[in-house]
Every structure is written in structure tokens, then in C-alpha cells.
């Protein structure tokens, strides 16, 4: 493949961020088709070599988890089993391909072109979110958001209803605020793989996350930035040479936290308020998780989630919820202790990485690997190509930039 074609192929990645939630077509009631539905094919554009061994390992793990779920999970709605299983297998294929592929290298003189496209995407979505927020403040509603939602994979009617009752959330080109924030953080990590400082873009991305109203997004951005401060300045060499800069940057960070404290404290308080989104995402489902870990019939077969969740009668707003908005809890409900052990194993790897990152966290390596488990707390729609793209895109760029550590 020629260099020019290769450049165009990688420029698809920032473009996909704009279109990731735009529905092209629909198969049945629960299978929207988007550009990332074809992600396995798109990955072939970047393919230089593939490790069949790694791919087989990934597919084998996926097959084992699927078999466990089928054998031990209780079926409450057999009609949705095939579709739900296909989605899980599809995600395994995408992750397996990204892990096993050696991507074509992006040459240094093309970095700026790709970065410009990412900057353009950030500018467009944050500007749109700002316009949506302005309309919400001025009119109490958002006809812009309502118009855009007609072209998205899922309706954001619950967000519009929330706004009618005085809430302030934006979604830009995405189907919900949490996914919007997740997309911005994914873009941010993609940009960071190029190893340059982008304070203006960082500020714009933070502004977009705040406009989304996603508490998970705000806290994740704060966590990742605080980690980077620690990795840069909490080592002997940096303390000797950069102490004033470290203190200034920490002071700026603390000022930001103080300004955001009323919002943070309010959202933390919501964790104890039944019916709030924070309660429904974190606290309410714990009873389901506990049941899945302590009862033989606690594992739910693919496709039966709605009925299982509804049986616990946990309120999401004024209605009984039927979905799980927490990916980690979803994995436990489907795979029980396997999900717990795999999560602990992965976090052990990340913690070991953190210990060795002080003074040497090349291109936000720790934050990139931490992003996968943290992202589980943003959404329950983790068995979707759209979610998978947000997770794997920064890894694709890291491998294409030949960052080995």
C-alpha cells in the first residue's frame, strides 16, 4: 500500500469519532448499523502482519466465556440470545484483532496531518455541545439535540426529559452524555500517543466533558491528569530540577478542584439518593452483583438482562430500570467470578505499570491501560462496536507509532 493511501486510512480514525453513533441502517429492533460495525474490515486497511497465535488465544478465551455463560446462565428471554451472543463475539473479534495485528507505521512527517484532524473533531463536538448548553439555558430545552437524535443509534429521549425538569446535559453527536465524555477522553488519549503537549486541546476536551454533565467523565479526567502530575514530578530527579513548576501545576489543579467542588459534592451525594443516575449506576445494582456471585442461578444468559434487572425493582428516575449502566457489573452478571478474577489480574498489571511509571510514563501509557477498566463505569453498552472503537483506537495509534513501552 502506498504512503498516500496509508495516510488517508489513518485519517479515518478521527473521522470515525464524529460518526461513531450515527445510524446507517437497522437490523431488527436491537442491532443498529454504524460505520464501526465494519471495524474488523477497516482494521485490514492498517494491517501489516497478524499473529494468528494471538488471535486464536483471544478467540479461545471468548469461546470459553460464551460456553460458560450458556451452560450456567439462566435464560429469561431466549429470543434475544443469538443477537446478544453475536455482539459479544464481535467485540472479542475486534479486541483480538487489535491485539494480534502489527499495524503499518505512521511516519513522523504525517503526525501533524492526523493531529489536525483530531483537533478539528474536538473543536466541532465541543462547539456543538456549547451551542446545545446555551439553548438549554436560554429556552429550557434543546431542539438541536432532539433533531440530531433522529440520526443516532439510540434515542436520547431520557436526556431530553431530564432537561425539561431543569437538568443540564449535552450530547453533541452522541446518544448519551456519558458516551460523549467517554469519546472525548478516548480522543484525548489518542492525541497523547503522539507525545506532544496540547494544553489548548486539553482545556477544550475538559470543557466538553463538563458540558456533557458526566460525573464519570469529570472524575476520570481529574484522575488521569493527577496521575500524570505524579509520574512527572514525584521522582528524585524531577523534584530537584522542577520543584517550582510542580508546585505551580499542582496549585492550578487544586484551584480547578475547588471551583468544581460544589458539583463534585452534589454528585457524590447523589450516590445515596435512590432514583438518581449515580445511585442507579453504582449503588443500586450491587444487590444484583452480590446475587450473581453467591447463587448458582445468579449468572444470566446473554439476551436475558432486561428481565433480570427489572425483577430487582431498582428505580432509575421515576421508572423501574431494565438496563445496567455499569460495564463491570454487567460482566459479573454474565460471567460471575471469572469477571472478578480477570479484572483483578488486569488491574494487577496496571498497578505494576504504575509503580514503574514515575519519571517514565511514556505517552500516557498508564492512563491508556487504565482507561479500559475505568470506562466500564461509564456505560453498560460494552458489547457494542461503538464502545469497542473508543477503547481500541488509542491502542491502534500507539502500535502504529511504534511505541513499545
Swiss-Prot record:
GO biological process: colanic acid metabolic process; lipopolysaccharide biosynthetic process; slime layer polysaccharide biosynthetic process
Pathway as given in its UniProt record: Slime biogenesis; slime polysaccharide biosynthesis
Localization, UniProt: Cell inner membrane
Main location: membrane
Xref: InterPro entries: Colanic_acid_synth_WcaD
GO cellular component, one term: plasma membrane
Topological category with respect to the lipid bilayer: Multi-pass membrane protein
Key words, A-Z: Cell inner membrane, Cell membrane, Lipopolysaccharide biosynthesis, Membrane, Transmembrane, Transmembrane helix
Transmembrane segments: 5-25, 27-47, 55-75, 81-101, 117-137, 171-191, 204-224, 244-264, 282-302, 327-347, 376-396
Keyword field contains Signal: no
Protein known as: Putative colanic acid polymerase
